């Protein structure tokens, strides 16, 4: 990952919910590592969902969403981000490539399905199936997150998405 705002640099927004030191934070760090490892000129804006807003979403050329599963749903912080940004960006973010990663105590499908339904309203383009990490975070799960970050970075840089 490179810093700066050169026009050739692709821009990824990574938003996430969860608690400091939690499993989702471990996954976020791995996704960031994957983006950083890319040879492509990428600018990453990584923010807790409660701090991200309309300007961040309009800035993004790719979106990664990390959330814990809370009671079979996405985190309140991620839902709040979507509630605050939907109408202000309506009609302005169609086709935005996105992917989701979820730390789940259950099966994670409720959170994944809810985000997918909302993404249809935004008219985003899903670039990968939801990455659901059930239970403890393993090295294999971290590797999948690294690969998700690399996929987004490479896909944007190569014009695939």
Give residue spans per PLM region.
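N-terminal beta1-alpha1 ligand-phosphate binding loop
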Residues: 2-36
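Short histidine/acidic/glycine/proline-rich micro-motifs that form metal-
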Residues: 18-21, 103-107, 132-138
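Glycine-rich phosphate/pyrophosphate-binding loop and the adjoining helix
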Residues: 2-8, 38, 53, 126-161
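Residues at alpha-helix caps and immediate loop-helix transition turns in enzyme cores, especially N-
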Residues: 24-27, 77, 111, 141-144
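A short beta-strand-loop structural module common to alpha/beta enzyme folds
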Residues: 40-51
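Helix-loop-strand module that forms the ligand-binding subsite of alpha/beta enzymes
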Residues: 49-126
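A structural signal for isolated positions on well-ordered beta-strands in alpha/beta enzyme cores
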Residues: 13, 43-45, 99
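Short helix-loop-beta junction
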Residues: 28-41, 120-125
